[in-house]
Structure formats: structure tokens, C-alpha cells
Amino acid sequence: AAAGGGRDREGAPCLYATMSQQADNFFVLQIDPKTGATRQFSVDVPESNYTTAVYMGRDGRLYIGAAHSGHLFCFDPAADGLLDLGQINGDAAIFPCRIDEDGKGRLWIGSYGTADLSSYDLRTREFVRYGRMDETDMYNYPLVNADGTVACFIAQTLLHVVVFDPQTERRQTV
């Protein structure tokens, strides 16, 4: 589960919590901090059981990567619901490990399965898939640097960092 602060459709402060479960898909709780009242939102995409990566965007939307469907979802307060933004990277991304945002309004998503890296442009609503960041390991946890490069923390067999430059698409192990 993950939690964070945000706004509801009326612009009032609220809390968001994601809840994972084995028997069904994940859901999001919207919590009124004054009254404790909750509202629950679910997704319909099969095998979206776990919220393995959650990010509160600068746009006030909650972005959620789901295992085992490998889909990116968005809780949009204005739409008052969960939106399916699509599959992150087919079978290469069984579940996302981490989501971060750059200064250009792109979400960077590292996934388990192939330690792949994908971006999702919030303006154009399109994914770009950059492939594996490591040929052996399977987990990728990206962090966007101030200069726009993406530091991919690669795990589990041999912990290391691969720096990816989106401008040149060059990868460098550091």
C-alpha cells in the first residue's frame, strides 16, 4: 500500500491510499482527512493486483503501476476516477518498480522482468520504450537527475547504476 496527499474533484485536500490484494485488482481509497469518509475506486484490467510503483505527479494526479498486468493507471481528481493509460511495455514489463517525472512532463518507469525503461509523455499521452538497461538483471528503479538524464538503479544480482541519456539514448554503467 502507498499513501499521499492530494485534492479531490472539488479541490479540497484529501488523502489517497492504494491497496493491493491477491484475490482481486487493486483499488484506490480517497480519504477526507476532516471526516474520515472514504470513497473507493477500482480498475477492470485483469491481473492488476498490486500497486508496485506509485507517484503523485506535479499535475495533481496519482500515477499507479500495476503488477501483474504491467499497466499504468492514473487517478485523475477532475475525472473523479481511475484511468487506464495502457500497457507500459508488453511482456517485458511484468510490473513497474518505480516511477519518476522529469522537467518536460514525462514519467519514467522502470520495470521488473527485463530491467527495462519506458517513458510516458503526459502531454501527448504516448509511451516510448527504450528497452533493457541491463542484460542480466531484472529490476530497474529509475530516478530523474536535474540534468534530465535518468539514473537506473539496477538490482538484484549485481547492484549498480546505469545512467541513461534520453537525448542520445546512450547508456553508461557507473
Model-identified regions with their sequence ranges:
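Fold-core signature of tandem repeat domains
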Residues: L62, F75, L82-L85, L107, ...
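Surface loop/turn motifs at the tips and blade-to-blade linkers of beta-strand repeat domains
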Residues: S42-E47, G86-D91, Y130-E135, V174
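A short loop-to-beta-strand structural motif that recurs across blades of beta-propeller domains
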Residues: F27-L29, H71-F73, D116-S118, H160-V162
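Repeated scaffold domains used in trafficking and secretory/extracellular systems
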Residues: A1-R7, S48-Y55, A93-I99, D137-V144
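Short loop/turn segments immediately following the C-termini of beta-strands
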Residues: S20-Q22, A67, Y112, A155-T157
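Conserved beta-propeller blade signature
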Residues: C14-T18, R61-I64, R106-I109, V150-F153
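Short loop/turn segments that connect beta-strands within beta-propeller blades
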Residues: D32-G36, D76-D80, D121-R125, D165-E169
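Beta-strand-rich domains and repeat architectures in extracellular enzymes and scaffolds
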Residues: A1-F26
